[in-house]
Amino acid sequence: MLRPGTFALTALLAGLSAVGPLTTDMYLPSLPDIARQFGASSAQVQLTISAYLVGFAAGQIIYGPVSDRHGRKPVLIGAIALYCAASLACALSTSIEMLIVARAFQALGGSGGIVLTRAIVRDIYSGAHAGRELSVIGSVMALAPVLAPILGGLIQTAFGWRVTFLALVGAGFAGAAVVWVLLPETLNNRAAEPVSLPSMLRSYRIVGRNPAYLAYLSITSASYAGLFAWISGSAFVLQDLYGLAPFDFGVAFALGSVGYMIGSAIAARLVIRLGLDGVLGLGGCACAAGGLAMVAAVASGLTSSMSLVLPMAVYLAGLGMVLPQGIAGAMTPFPERAGAASSLFGFLQQTAAAVCGAAVGWFLGQSAWPLALGVATMGFATFGLWLATRGLRARAVKH
């Protein structure tokens, strides 16, 4: 079994957290081909992303309280099993409607990894130390959005999109085996109350009444929604409007994702010195700057893919700072309800991302403006919410 505080455990948790970006980003180069194969519109194909986010959000409501009662490890293994079955259904889909439904169930299983990783970190760490651990996990897991679209582009070019989902089935089985053999159970004090709808709602009500929790949640959700504006629109804009091939799109998307790695690495170095809020503000500023730069690029009429990718890299660097600090700040007041706090956080965060991503997909046509405006709006919202809620967060720290 891996011991808490070791890099091996951190790497395993990073791998579990990477399920979300891996499952989303690996098939992005295939979106235009999926649309052509099923005779679907770009808006219909975007629903495979929105359905994933809705399923991801719903799963997070369930896993936290259940794991508070039954432990992290058995719940995690069950979630991975569902993920593998749904990924196989995606590969075998015969219509866009079947793919949309299968993606929702794929997310329902895949959400267990990120929810339970947050809860495991809270079992072991708290405060700035939890923020540092989540930043390190973010730095490692950031390899997923860098490598996934490149790998997805290669698979799409050589074999087609169905093989992409078969590869995810294999990755899921490998992850389940590693968890079964190496992951220790980190929950020492299990919830005494049996899991039921009233008990779950009671936990969420307690967590949701905390003003600091809501402040961190709003900041993080805004920044995360900007990411899904990019995910929803970039495949069609960069391939259909800017002329990139699937593999070239994968490389361009990966270059943007390097920004997240850089932001996570910066956060891990600075959080002990600047504190959660200092790094959070720096990240919010980067998100706003990246969004503004993307709007300026579209307004100037630039048609190079880098005119969108580089501003998004700045935005993602900000997200790499905001995401771990926002999660750690929200989770700190709830050592005895870490699972519930993580679940509610993830549900609302993913819901915001689903709405933003669907909106960009709906308005997307023969223009990059919906994409640029979606990213910029969320970037300025992130920084604005950081400024507007400083008092709430400061009072929470004093208490």
What residues fall within each predicted segment?
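Helix-loop-helix hairpin linking two adjacent transmembrane segments in secondary transporters
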Residues: M98, S135-V181
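Conserved MFS/SLC helix-loop-helix module at the cytosolic interface between two early adjacent transmembrane helices
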Residues: A58-E97
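Structural signature of the two symmetry-related core transmembrane helices
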Residues: P74-A89, V169, V279-M294
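Juxtamembrane intracellular "pre-TM" segments in multi-pass secondary transporters
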Residues: M1-L2, T186-L217
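Cytoplasmic helix-loop-helix junction between adjacent transmembrane helices
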Residues: A102-L143
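Helix-to-loop junctions at the C-terminal end of transmembrane segments
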Residues: Q60-H70, G263-L276
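Paired small-residue
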Residues: L82-A89, E97-F105, M306-M312
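Helix-breaking motifs and short loop linkers at transmembrane-helix boundaries and internal kinks
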Residues: Q37-G39, G71, L92-M98, G109, ...
